[in-house]
Amino acid sequence: MNNNDLFQASRRRFLAQLGGLTVAGMLGPSLLTPRRATAAQAATDAVISKEGILTGSHWGAIRATVKDGRFVAAKPFELDKYPSKMIAGLPDHVHNAARIRYPMVRVDWLRKRHLSDTSQRGDNRFVRVSWDEALDMFYEELERVQKTHGPSALLTASGWQSTGMFHNASGMLAKAIALHGNSVGTGGDYSTGAAQVILPRVVGSMEVYEQQTSWPLVLQNSKTIVLWGSDLLKNQQANWWCPDHDVYEYYAQLKAKVAAGEIEVISIDPVVTSTHEYLGREHVKHIAVNPQTDVPLQLALAHTLYSENLYDKNFLANYCVGFEQFLPYLLGEKDGQPKDAAWAEKLTGIDAETIRGLARQMAANRTQIIAGWCVQRMQHGEQWAWMIVVLAAMLGQIGLPGGGFGFGWHYNGAGTPGRKGVILSGFSGSTSIPPVHDNSDYKGYSSTIPIARFIDAILEPGKVINWNGKSVKLPPLKMCIFAGTNPFHRHQQINRIIEGLRKLETVIAIDNQWTSTCRFADIVLPATTQFERNDLDQYGNHSNRGIIAMKQVVPPQFEARNDFDIFRELCRRFNREEAFTEGLDEMGWLKRIWQEGVQQGKGRGVHLPAFDDFWNNKEYVEFDHPQMFVRHQAFREDPDLEPLGTPSGLIEIYSKTIADMNYDDCQGHPMWFEKIERSHGGPGSQKYPLHLQSVHPDFRLHSQLCESETLRQQYTVAGKEPVFINPQDASARGIRNGDVVRVFNARGQVLAGAVVSDRYAPGVARIHEGAWYDPDKGGEPGALCKYGNPNVLTIDIGTSQLAQATSAHTTLVEIEKYNGTVEQVTAFNGPVEMVAQCEYVPASQVKS
């Protein structure tokens, strides 16, 4: 399985293990208004407006208005009662100065190909070429790398791309490259890299992308809800498939119950989150734990539960293994230090009695633990995820409605009951056709590496690392192809990325915006946005509310092409066009995908209309038949018949499998490990005292829509990405609201606009991830980022030898008022087009 298949699989794990429901059989209620049903098990013909062109996106379904050939306005789909504010920026996604208009090639690469001066990468100087020239160069580089170096030298990567079941860049990239030859695959992802590796060892499944207990059952049964590093309100604005935002209706119900005193919400977070603010500061108990000390807090809670006899012995005996091996560490018999509340107080900044009181409250009533993803994106992030499960096991409420734990509540409308319906297929990255270069000789190097270590592979080829029980020899990468992704937003330590990219012979980027990845590429190919093509998408993710037509809003802009057409033309150059297209064009694929859905529906008793009727008349169909769901209920009711996917079939508080790996940074049971750098008195805090969060943004999806001036006008400060800072920290540095500040550490420096807010604990600052990198010195390492990309500052180390995932939130910085000349932001301007500087040179004329 290559990296693109792994990404698709991980993002869609939420379709599996839904308490006996299959992919095609998820059930759920209408959330906002009662829906009428036609036949007992038929898709409903929803009564919808026809004003505007209907289409979908990561931010929701919209009605698009077109005037004089331009996409000028986006109105929420009439069934979306809680639309995201981000849809206001969608027209800018199509029409903006950073739009990639033509195929372009970096100046020196055009002259010298793989022998070019790679220190010029990032200087933003490009030459416009024809599509035929660009695709010829693409093909010739694939040929050269396969013949000269073999499959161990080529890596492809995709990411969040655009919505649509057919037009997915990851699948198309994977299939096209697989038809040409083998390459290096990647495993894991940047969102949940630590949790998705540790949790299968502990509870037998990834957990992070799965459906959660239905919100109606939580609202009915929970007395205490613990939000542990989870900001539901902010993060549910954008989903993998087109969101319906129905989950916000349950947040409104939760708000009412909290105000009425029926449910108590506890937020464990150094920040007053958007969800916390929405529910009301006066109603939410705030545990402002010092950053990166969540595990000491968890251990102290476990110690209190044990020492005060508040834990569920029967649950531990019947559903878990390994508590006896964990206990000596918890009690201090192993290292002489009991992990009690007094010990944790010194690390966490939380009063010992508050910790003990929290443990008592969690044990007193039905408690639902809602865990986010940000805490596991730290060094040793596996330990926090493991301890969430241990705490829930000690409480003994796993598998009960409104109890237990969950790691995916903030994603894909989790907790919204699913509906019985069809899950459409899409364009798969797999193929049974053998490649042109059927070479599987990786010369002793590993064919799959952890995605968060791909820069390591470039900088340290041949290095052997551990990864989830395996030994990995990093391959000597020479060429990378990026489609539908932006490593400058998702990978850490940008100056290290730049050093790595300089060692590559060729970088190819396929995108619709001039992101930093494109600026540092050699060949840049312009792809369409989802608003320039036709597609199909699920409406609602976990809810599976319906299927929506994604109608083309405007024609492809400038010389942009669909990814499908780009890779079709590439495959034609090595006689695999038919194998890639399977004889179908865009509408042919949509009809095939729809017909597969029709057949799937027949097996489920769900009727879909004929494609032409749907596409030309209905545009949207809605599914019915709600069914409530309780996470882990089947396991609780019969652990023998419904075992977990662990070696024991039970929850593994102690894992012999992990213990046998002999890793010093991830052992047989959860533990506290000091970090390489940590604020509030931790290592490195004397020089860089502020912890930097780089969490999901509020006005974009990762780096998507950062190009939107409409949205930037709503959140930027002095034209910069905002940095949020506590009033005490700001005052001590002479910083006021609106000041341009320099945020820096030994890894780099950025400018940002100060927002002074008491929502952030002293010693904590935040810059949202996804801000576009804007160096003041082109592609030089160490340049000052004029806009404010936090990955200039983050650290590129693995969480541990187990997951080798990102440790973005193990980052310390200092902030000072900037007194230098504030240069104009140029990240959103596109490239410098060089004219008549050089000519296209065929590969045969390039001298080694």
From Swiss-Prot:
Subcellular location(s) of the protein: Periplasm
Pfam families from the UniProt entry: Molybdopterin (PF00384), Molybdopterin_N (PF18364), Molydop_binding (PF01568)
Alphabetical GO biological process terms: aerobic respiration; anaerobic electron transport chain; anaerobic respiration; regulation of pH
Cofactor note: Binds 1 molybdenum-bis(molybdopterin guanine dinucleotide) (Mo-bis-MGD) cofactor per subunit.
Keywords, in A-Z order: Metal-binding, Molybdenum, Oxidoreductase, Periplasm, Signal
One term under GO cellular component: trimethylamine-N-oxide reductase (cytochrome c) complex
Subunit structure: Interacts with the N-terminal domain of TorC.
Alphabetized NCBIfam families for the sequence: bisC_fam, PRK15102.1, torA
Family: Belongs to the prokaryotic molybdopterin-containing oxidoreductase family.
Protein name in the entry: Trimethylamine-N-oxide reductase 1
Gene coding for it: torA
